[in-house]
Amino acid sequence: PILEKTRQEYLMYLLKLCTGLSLLMSAYNDVIFAPHLMAENGLGNIFLLVEVVIGILLILNFHIFAATILLFLLCIGVAFTFGALVALEYLNMTGIACCLLLFNFHPEKYRVHLKAYSISSLRILTGIALVSLGLSEKLLNPDLGEFFVAQYQWNFMLNLGFTDFSNELFVFCAGMMEVNFGIILIIGTTTRVNILVVSAFMFTSNITFFASGNYSEALLEIFGHLPFIATAMILIFFGS
Protein backbone atom coordinates (compact mmCIF):
# COMPACT_ATOMS: atom_id res chain seq x y z
CA PRO A 1 0.00 0.00 0.00
CA ILE A 2 2.83 2.42 0.82
CA LEU A 3 4.54 1.74 -2.52
CA GLU A 4 1.21 2.15 -4.33
CA LYS A 5 0.58 5.48 -2.61
CA THR A 6 4.09 6.66 -3.49
CA ARG A 7 3.55 5.79 -7.16
CA GLN A 8 0.27 7.67 -7.19
CA GLU A 9 1.90 10.73 -5.64
CA TYR A 10 4.73 10.64 -8.19
CA LEU A 11 2.23 10.42 -11.06
CA MET A 12 0.20 13.30 -9.67
CA TYR A 13 3.34 15.38 -9.34
CA LEU A 14 4.16 14.52 -12.95
CA LEU A 15 0.76 15.95 -13.91
CA LYS A 16 1.50 19.11 -11.91
CA LEU A 17 5.00 19.43 -13.38
CA CYS A 18 3.93 18.93 -17.00
CA THR A 19 0.94 21.26 -16.68
CA GLY A 20 3.06 23.88 -14.94
CA LEU A 21 5.78 23.77 -17.60
CA SER A 22 3.18 23.99 -20.37
CA LEU A 23 1.54 27.02 -18.75
CA LEU A 24 4.87 28.79 -18.24
CA MET A 25 5.84 28.19 -21.87
CA SER A 26 2.45 29.52 -23.00
CA ALA A 27 2.88 32.64 -20.88
CA TYR A 28 6.42 33.12 -22.24
CA ASN A 29 4.96 33.11 -25.77
CA ASP A 30 2.13 35.51 -24.79
CA VAL A 31 -0.60 32.93 -25.39
CA ILE A 32 -3.23 31.19 -23.29
CA PHE A 33 -2.98 27.38 -23.47
CA ALA A 34 -2.26 27.34 -27.24
CA PRO A 35 -0.57 29.50 -29.94
CA HIS A 36 -3.85 30.65 -31.51
CA LEU A 37 -5.20 32.02 -28.20
CA MET A 38 -3.23 35.26 -28.14
CA ALA A 39 -3.22 37.37 -25.00
CA GLU A 40 -4.33 40.88 -25.92
CA ASN A 41 -5.04 44.09 -23.97
CA GLY A 42 -5.12 44.33 -20.19
CA LEU A 43 -7.25 41.25 -19.62
CA GLY A 44 -4.84 39.17 -21.65
CA ASN A 45 -1.96 40.33 -19.45
CA ILE A 46 -3.92 39.26 -16.39
CA PHE A 47 -4.41 35.83 -17.95
CA LEU A 48 -0.66 35.59 -18.58
CA LEU A 49 0.09 36.51 -14.98
CA VAL A 50 -2.37 33.89 -13.74
CA GLU A 51 -0.71 31.31 -16.01
CA VAL A 52 2.68 32.12 -14.51
CA VAL A 53 1.39 31.90 -10.93
CA ILE A 54 -0.36 28.58 -11.59
CA GLY A 55 2.70 27.18 -13.35
CA ILE A 56 5.05 28.10 -10.50
CA LEU A 57 2.71 26.75 -7.81
CA LEU A 58 2.24 23.45 -9.64
CA ILE A 59 5.94 22.95 -10.32
CA LEU A 60 6.83 23.75 -6.70
CA ASN A 61 3.95 21.53 -5.50
CA PHE A 62 2.88 24.43 -3.30
CA HIS A 63 -0.65 25.56 -2.42
CA ILE A 64 -2.21 23.14 -4.91
CA PHE A 65 -5.72 24.09 -3.81
CA ALA A 66 -5.07 27.73 -4.75
CA ALA A 67 -3.47 26.65 -8.03
CA THR A 68 -6.48 24.53 -9.00
CA ILE A 69 -8.93 27.33 -8.17
CA LEU A 70 -6.88 29.73 -10.30
CA LEU A 71 -6.85 27.18 -13.13
CA PHE A 72 -10.65 26.90 -12.89
CA LEU A 73 -10.93 30.70 -13.08
CA LEU A 74 -8.54 30.82 -16.04
CA CYS A 75 -10.66 28.26 -17.90
CA ILE A 76 -13.76 30.34 -17.20
CA GLY A 77 -11.92 33.44 -18.43
CA VAL A 78 -10.99 31.64 -21.65
CA ALA A 79 -14.64 30.68 -22.16
CA PHE A 80 -15.84 34.28 -21.79
CA THR A 81 -13.00 35.75 -23.88
CA PHE A 82 -12.64 33.24 -26.72
CA GLY A 83 -16.04 31.53 -26.65
CA ALA A 84 -17.59 28.33 -25.34
CA LEU A 85 -16.29 26.22 -28.25
CA VAL A 86 -12.67 27.11 -27.47
CA ALA A 87 -13.31 26.33 -23.81
CA LEU A 88 -14.57 22.88 -24.84
CA GLU A 89 -11.45 22.32 -26.94
CA TYR A 90 -9.30 22.85 -23.85
CA LEU A 91 -11.63 21.24 -21.34
CA ASN A 92 -8.79 18.86 -20.49
CA MET A 93 -7.28 21.74 -18.49
CA THR A 94 -10.47 21.88 -16.44
CA GLY A 95 -10.18 18.11 -16.06
CA ILE A 96 -6.65 18.52 -14.70
CA ALA A 97 -7.90 21.11 -12.21
CA CYS A 98 -10.70 18.75 -11.10
CA CYS A 99 -8.31 15.83 -10.82
CA LEU A 100 -5.75 17.67 -8.70
CA LEU A 101 -8.41 19.26 -6.51
CA LEU A 102 -10.18 15.97 -5.72
CA PHE A 103 -6.96 13.96 -5.38
CA ASN A 104 -5.62 16.44 -2.81
CA PHE A 105 -8.96 17.15 -1.16
CA HIS A 106 -9.11 18.34 2.44
CA PRO A 107 -10.14 17.08 4.94
CA GLU A 108 -8.23 13.89 4.19
CA LYS A 109 -11.01 11.55 5.36
CA TYR A 110 -12.97 12.35 2.18
CA ARG A 111 -9.95 11.99 -0.09
CA VAL A 112 -10.09 8.20 -0.43
CA HIS A 113 -13.62 8.34 -1.84
CA LEU A 114 -12.94 11.31 -4.10
CA LYS A 115 -9.79 9.88 -5.71
CA ALA A 116 -11.88 7.67 -7.99
CA TYR A 117 -13.87 10.71 -9.14
CA SER A 118 -10.64 12.62 -9.76
CA ILE A 119 -9.50 10.13 -12.39
CA SER A 120 -12.98 9.90 -13.93
CA SER A 121 -13.24 13.68 -14.26
CA LEU A 122 -9.81 13.81 -15.91
CA ARG A 123 -10.74 11.03 -18.34
CA ILE A 124 -14.19 12.36 -19.27
CA LEU A 125 -13.20 16.01 -19.70
CA THR A 126 -10.13 15.03 -21.74
CA GLY A 127 -12.43 12.94 -23.93
CA ILE A 128 -14.79 15.89 -24.45
CA ALA A 129 -11.80 18.06 -25.40
CA LEU A 130 -10.69 15.51 -28.02
CA VAL A 131 -14.19 15.31 -29.51
CA SER A 132 -14.42 19.11 -29.63
CA LEU A 133 -11.01 19.44 -31.31
CA GLY A 134 -11.88 16.77 -33.87
CA LEU A 135 -15.13 18.49 -34.77
CA SER A 136 -14.13 22.17 -34.69
CA GLU A 137 -10.65 22.01 -36.25
CA LYS A 138 -11.14 19.19 -38.73
CA LEU A 139 -14.60 17.80 -39.51
CA LEU A 140 -16.63 21.03 -39.32
CA ASN A 141 -13.84 23.32 -40.50
CA PRO A 142 -11.62 21.22 -42.77
CA ASP A 143 -10.09 24.26 -44.50
CA LEU A 144 -8.29 25.17 -41.29
CA GLY A 145 -6.85 21.68 -40.92
CA GLU A 146 -5.89 21.43 -44.59
CA PHE A 147 -4.07 24.78 -44.45
CA PHE A 148 -2.12 23.59 -41.41
CA VAL A 149 -1.25 20.25 -43.03
CA ALA A 150 -0.12 21.91 -46.26
CA GLN A 151 1.90 24.64 -44.55
CA TYR A 152 3.87 22.30 -42.30
CA GLN A 153 3.86 19.27 -44.65
CA TRP A 154 2.22 17.32 -41.86
CA ASN A 155 0.69 14.58 -44.05
CA PHE A 156 3.06 11.82 -42.98
CA MET A 157 1.02 9.25 -44.93
CA LEU A 158 2.64 10.61 -48.11
CA ASN A 159 6.06 10.00 -46.58
CA LEU A 160 5.02 6.41 -45.87
CA GLY A 161 4.33 5.82 -49.57
CA PHE A 162 0.56 6.38 -49.69
CA THR A 163 0.69 8.81 -52.62
CA ASP A 164 -3.11 8.95 -53.05
CA PHE A 165 -3.64 10.02 -49.43
CA SER A 166 -4.65 13.65 -50.01
CA ASN A 167 -4.56 16.39 -47.39
CA GLU A 168 -8.36 16.46 -47.40
CA LEU A 169 -8.52 12.75 -46.61
CA PHE A 170 -5.81 13.11 -43.97
CA VAL A 171 -7.71 15.88 -42.16
CA PHE A 172 -10.97 13.91 -42.34
CA CYS A 173 -9.34 10.75 -40.95
CA ALA A 174 -7.59 12.72 -38.21
CA GLY A 175 -10.87 14.34 -37.20
CA MET A 176 -12.76 11.05 -37.14
CA MET A 177 -10.04 9.43 -35.07
CA GLU A 178 -10.01 12.27 -32.54
CA VAL A 179 -13.79 12.08 -32.18
CA ASN A 180 -13.75 8.29 -31.80
CA PHE A 181 -10.86 8.34 -29.32
CA GLY A 182 -12.65 11.05 -27.33
CA ILE A 183 -15.92 9.10 -27.23
CA ILE A 184 -14.09 5.98 -26.05
CA LEU A 185 -12.45 8.01 -23.28
CA ILE A 186 -15.81 9.43 -22.21
CA ILE A 187 -17.40 5.97 -22.12
CA GLY A 188 -14.41 4.57 -20.24
CA THR A 189 -13.90 1.33 -22.17
CA THR A 190 -10.40 0.08 -23.09
CA THR A 191 -9.01 3.28 -21.60
CA ARG A 192 -5.38 2.14 -21.49
CA VAL A 193 -5.28 0.90 -25.09
CA ASN A 194 -7.14 3.97 -26.33
CA ILE A 195 -4.86 6.45 -24.62
CA LEU A 196 -1.77 4.59 -25.84
CA VAL A 197 -2.95 4.92 -29.44
CA VAL A 198 -3.71 8.64 -29.00
CA SER A 199 -0.27 9.15 -27.46
CA ALA A 200 1.35 7.36 -30.40
CA PHE A 201 -0.33 9.73 -32.86
CA MET A 202 0.74 12.77 -30.83
CA PHE A 203 4.30 11.42 -30.77
CA THR A 204 4.11 11.03 -34.56
CA SER A 205 3.02 14.66 -34.93
CA ASN A 206 6.02 15.84 -32.92
CA ILE A 207 8.39 13.69 -34.98
CA THR A 208 6.85 15.08 -38.17
CA PHE A 209 7.56 18.66 -37.07
CA PHE A 210 11.18 17.80 -36.31
CA ALA A 211 11.59 15.91 -39.58
CA SER A 212 10.28 18.88 -41.58
CA GLY A 213 12.76 21.22 -39.89
CA ASN A 214 10.16 23.23 -37.97
CA TYR A 215 12.06 23.03 -34.70
CA SER A 216 10.40 25.97 -32.97
CA GLU A 217 6.94 24.64 -33.82
CA ALA A 218 8.02 21.18 -32.68
CA LEU A 219 9.12 22.58 -29.33
CA LEU A 220 5.84 24.44 -28.91
CA GLU A 221 3.97 21.27 -29.85
CA ILE A 222 5.84 19.25 -27.23
CA PHE A 223 5.21 21.78 -24.47
CA GLY A 224 1.57 22.07 -25.54
CA HIS A 225 1.19 18.30 -25.33
CA LEU A 226 2.86 17.96 -21.91
CA PRO A 227 -0.44 18.05 -19.95
CA PHE A 228 -1.86 15.36 -22.23
CA ILE A 229 1.29 13.24 -21.91
CA ALA A 230 0.98 13.33 -18.12
CA THR A 231 -2.76 12.64 -18.39
CA ALA A 232 -2.01 9.63 -20.58
CA MET A 233 0.43 8.23 -18.03
CA ILE A 234 -2.11 8.64 -15.24
CA LEU A 235 -4.87 6.95 -17.23
CA ILE A 236 -2.52 4.11 -18.20
CA PHE A 237 -1.67 3.61 -14.52
CA PHE A 238 -5.17 4.03 -13.05
CA GLY A 239 -7.29 2.87 -15.99
CA SER A 240 -10.84 4.18 -16.18
Where are the language model's segments positioned?
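Juxtamembrane membrane-water interface segments that cap and precede transmembrane helices
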Residues: Q153-F162
